[in-house]
Amino acid sequence: MNRTFCNVALAVPLRTTFTYAVPEQLRAAVQPGVRVLVPFRQKSLVGVVVDLPERASEKAKIREISKVLNVIPALTPGLIELGHWIAGYYLAPVGEVFRAMLPPVTELRTQQQIIITAAGHQLVDSRPRTLGEEFAAEEIALLSKLIAKNGILPASTLEKSGVSSWALQRLARRGLVEIQHSLLARKQKTQTIVTWRTEDSEKREKSTNGSVEKRGRPLQGKALERFQEQTRRVRELLESRRGPLPLPQVLKLVEVSRSAVERMLACDLLYSWEEPIDPAEDPFDVGYAPPAHELNADQHMALKRIRARFELGEFGVQLLYGVTGSGKTEVYLRAIQETLARQKTALVLVPEIALTLWMGRQCRAWFGARFEGVAVLHSALSDVERAREWWRVRNADARVVVGTRSAVFAPLERLGLIIVDEEQENSYKQEETPRYNGRDVAIVRAKMENAVALLGSATPSLESYHHATTGKYELLTLGSRVENRALANVEVVDLREEFQQTHQASSISAKLRAGIQECLARGTQALVLINRRGYSWSVLCRSCGASVQCANCSISMTYHKNRNRLECHYCGFVAQTPKNCPKCDSKYVYFFGEGSERVEERLREEFPTARIARLDRDTTRTKRQYQETLGAFTGGALDILVGTQMLAKGHDFQRVTLVGVISADGLLSMPDFRASEHTFQLLTQVAGRAGRGELHGRVLIQTYYPEHYAIQDALKQDYLSFFERETNFRRTMGYPPFTSLAIVIVRNTNLEKAIRWSRQLSEYFSPHNGKGVRILGPAAAPLARLKKEYRFQFLLKSPKRSVLTKLLAGALHHCEKNEIPDTAVIVDMDPLSLM
């Protein structure tokens, strides 16, 4: 019998696949897209089958695959094609690409079933007495048992019945039985839901001072008063929300103990039951979902043009540019509705994990609370949760996927629409191999699957808006806020003048302090943005001027007061806070700069009665922490929310009337040609969080550089003015969208090797410099040492991306010939940062 082969992509830093032989007993299960366990050198690795070649090289010794891990292919043919495109475009190892595309390897339970076919039925019915002439006894026994069991048997029962796998395979090859695999459902996690009992509630509430056998002694005195106050707050919450709520949310929003709620249940004041938890659902959802608005003229026109694109039945990219609060989400939801009505599926990408919960909630509110067709995919899910969601999508149990960057690989079939919300965000760019941009991959996937790609933003990237103005993308514009609500008033606080007046370098100006006080007096909410984590940026010595540096990176360490230690935000290195300067032993060390932790502390000092929380990576390390804080703020349990840039993206806080930006200068000072763009985008986005409800909003931007055009245009929320000024700068300096960029970094823990290899690569680049491409470097990277590795950087510019691709492919081949390890060379195509 001829041997069967398969090409397997392995997660190793090599730009090739590996050929393996398929054992006879596994041939029925091996097909493109399945994960397999294979021997590789002296160990076993998990890989994905990408194709089945007819023959293999006769020179090489072909080893056999060891095991098929998923009998149902994890990747569709379209995703395999997309993976090869990513590997080619981003010059990434193909195995690393497919590793990024796949869900976590978890032991999902499957069941193998044996089903008799119509041909098998016909054979048994027509020749019951002569089967023995052609079939073995165990084959006849299997066919008879299938007939007796209505045509279906679990494969696990065959061995007990004395039927061999050989007999099963022989019947399957003759078309008399089929072998099918299905996923076994796991028991779902549940959560407690509580609601207020309305019948005779007042009578029961008054009697709660009586004995409750389930809870022990009756309450008296202050304990009774405290319980009655807690009962009142719970009742007000549940009645004002007009519906049941998850117990964790009730505990958070009204700040009551679990034991108090249990006593209310025992007193029959509350009714509770268990409901399954869907990973797509936010258990801290405060129940708010904006109602469907009557569409304004701009929204009508945008939807009309989206429908027209659907009617054409062909690929296209549309850029939905709308001011903050203009109703882009409603356009998204109606576009998804149109897609589902056409029996197709939809994919929604969002830049932050927290926004997956919010967008999933919008879908549920729009399509109905019991709509089970929404799946979520993001890194905060556990491996098991992610795998379950992935297979829900793969098995067509979910028709809408909401997720962050990696959700672009969701195995949806019949894909009709891909939405990329806040398409300009850097978080769509992967920082590790493979260094793909989720937005650009989404566009390519839409093209491959003949779907529509809808990019949305209030501050589009210069590249996307340039494509829209030149006709490559179709521009859809939402020019006004929903219900004609006014944009927030944006004011600049000049910190130079503030210092001259107060002679203090406080992070909270007098104007911001007064604005927060006014918010508290009115009972509305305030957001305070500080785009730095920690307590202080660095620890400096007043004697010698040295800062405390990370042992692994060329970067100052950040002081975190709540943990009383220094941390590197790049490699995670931790050190004790020094009492003396590590360099000169001076005792005159001080903390320089303020981060979100210090600003939170200042606000607590200024407003001791205010309810304040902080939202950054330090306070939201788990999915639950995200949900608790956002749920509490949205539900009105907090007055002030301090946070980093994650606050600026997409959230719809109805009661926020003030946004304060502690410093607009941090991003502007970065050594990056996109610094102005990032500053304008962040300021405009965060300004859009104010005044989204019925109350008017106000934004205060603190800066030492109020004259900069990025700040001036953000002040007016004038994207078109900023686009024109920044485009002129990019055209003059030869930056995107007028050229394509690539960065090559040579790295090693040994400085001499890093220098030698970068020189060898420079020798390859030198003859090409000036011939359709400009090559700068090698030079020490802005972060010259990172995670113990020394880094040298080349910057390549060309009007034609194909020139860069060809040149860089040659450079990688040159590295291979000169024995420069693959792991020592990073290629970043279309970088979003030059750091």
Regions found by a protein language model. Give the residues of each.
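Long hydrophobic segments that form regular secondary structure
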Residues: 759-764
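A C-terminal functional module that forms or caps the active site or interfaces directly
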Residues: 776
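Inter-lobe coupling/hinge segments of SF2-like helicase ATPases
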Residues: 290-296, 300-304, 313-755, 767, ...
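Juxtacatalytic substrate-recognition/specificity segment
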Residues: 789
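Accessory, non-ATPase domains that flank or precede helicase/AAA+ motor cores in DNA-metabolism machines
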Residues: 1-457, 469-485, 768, 795, ...
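A generic structural motif
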Residues: 13-15, 25, 44, 545, ...
